[in-house]
């Protein structure tokens, strides 16, 4: 059972989502509907985008805790560009470029300067957050044009253009990681860095690419945030890094690298957003969200560690049982002297 759970984390996350839907559907019949599903998906888009980027980084056995600050910085970038008179496309491209540069800088710190990822990105967390506040003077950005808000307006099947783009990104990343040699390089790098290098994988370039794409996903999340609420607070992105990591771990992405799928991370993000919707349904204050996210992350990490130890212990017991069985069988095999009485008599005569 434990081995099944470890090898099917995506299925476990999906089962948890369906179970929560069923329980809430019993409590409130209006909850179990297509409208509720699309509403949760719309709310989950920011976390899904962050989980996509975090997956790439975590698969290479790294971590990025600056994505919340990058999200806020890029949201401010697109807002300031729009208010300065730039078009929507140019403003979004500028924000994506800022996110890519921020992620690239993280990758340089980790890969070339050999700074541990947690230390490097803790530093850039404060750096990017401070830059965001310097640009805004600590003020909110308001008066955003309607063009930006149209990105989150439902157009087809109650899903917005950003929603459709998010689904395309999910499919593209699932194909990249699961069906291409380049995608498998992420797993090889996280599983065994030296072994991947011997196989010809350009591990430094790959890790820099992972951090850069993480920055792009954070920038896209910042654009989605600005389009959904129509203004940009000075605390935009706070705490999102913890939720992104929690979503990935919940969906089966290992902090030790080399394990997990993008689908699992997406399901983890959806489950966390669903839990937030439960808090709204129960009319609990909004500050419970971070508490629940931290509690879920801690619980999943503890469970994941205990599960891994239990599975390894079970594997060792099975190996020991097979070794013992083989030893017993070899002891019971008849010797040459047992099968040949003449050889046994000659041996006795020699003695």
Swiss-Prot record:
SS bond list: none
Assembly and oligomerization: The complex is composed of two ATP-binding proteins (LsrA), two transmembrane proteins (LsrC and LsrD) and a solute-binding protein (LsrB).
Record key words, sorted: Cell inner membrane, Cell membrane, Membrane, Transmembrane, Transmembrane helix, Transport
Major localization class: membrane
Organism: Yersinia pestis
Protein's UniProt keywords contain Transit peptide: no
Gene Ontology cellular-component annotations: plasma membrane
Pfam families attached to this UniProt entry: BPD_transp_2 (PF02653)
Protein's gene: lsrC
Topology term for the membrane: Multi-pass membrane protein
Family classification: Belongs to the binding-protein-dependent transport system permease family. AraH/RbsC subfamily.
Biological classification of the source: Bacteria, Pseudomonadati, Pseudomonadota, Gammaproteobacteria, Enterobacterales
Location relative to the cell: Cell inner membrane
TM segment ranges: 14-34, 39-59, 70-90, 93-113, 115-135, 155-175, 213-233, 252-272, 284-304
Name the record gives this protein: Autoinducer 2 import system permease protein LsrC
Domain of life: Bacteria
Molecular functions (GO terms): transmembrane transporter activity
């Amino acid at each position: 059972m434990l081995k099944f759970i470890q090898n099917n984390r995506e299925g476990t996350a999906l089962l948890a989502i369906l179970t929560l839907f069923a329980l809430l559907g019993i409590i409130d019949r209006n909850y179990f509907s297509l409208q509720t599903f699309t509403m949760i998906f719309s709310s989950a888009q920011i976390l899904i985008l962050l989980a996509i980027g975090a997956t790439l980084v975590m698969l290479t056995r790294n971590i990025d805790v600056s994505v919340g600050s990058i999200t806020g910085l890029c949201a401010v970038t697109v807002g300031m560009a729009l208010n300065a008179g730039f078009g929507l496309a140019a403003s979004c491209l500028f924000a994506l470029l800022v996110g890519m540069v921020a992620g690239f800088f993280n990758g340089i710190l980790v890969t070339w300067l050999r700074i541990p990822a947690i230390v490097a990105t803790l530093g850039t967390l404060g750096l990017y957050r401070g830059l965001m506040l310097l640009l805004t003077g600590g003020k909110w950005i308001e008066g955003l044009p309607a063009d930006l808000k149209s990105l989150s307006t439902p157009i087809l099947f109650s899903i917005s253009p950003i929603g459709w783009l998010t689904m395309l990104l999910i499919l593209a990343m699932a194909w990249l990681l699961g069906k291409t040699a380049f995608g498998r390089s992420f797993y090889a790098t996280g599983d065994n860095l030296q072994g991947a290098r011997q196989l010809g994988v350009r591990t430094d370039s790959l890790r820099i690419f992972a951090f850069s794409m993480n920055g792009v996903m954070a920038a896209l999340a910042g654009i989605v945030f600005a389009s959904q609420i129509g203004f940009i607070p000075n605390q935009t992105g706070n705490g999102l890094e913890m939720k992104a990591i929690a979503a990935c771990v919940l969906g089966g992405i290992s902090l030790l690298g080399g394990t997990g799928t993008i689908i699992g991370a997406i399901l983890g993000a959806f489950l966390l957003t669903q839990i937030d919707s439960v808090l709204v349904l129960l009319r609990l204050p909004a500050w419970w969200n971070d508490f629940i996210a931290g509690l879920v992350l801690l619980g999943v990490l503890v469970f994941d560690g205990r599960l891994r130890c239990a599975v390894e212990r079970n594997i060792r017991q099975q190996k020991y049982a097979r070794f013992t069985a083989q030893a017993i069988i070899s002891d019971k095999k008849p010797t040459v002297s047992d099968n040949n009485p003449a050889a046994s008599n000659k041996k006795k005569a020699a003695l």
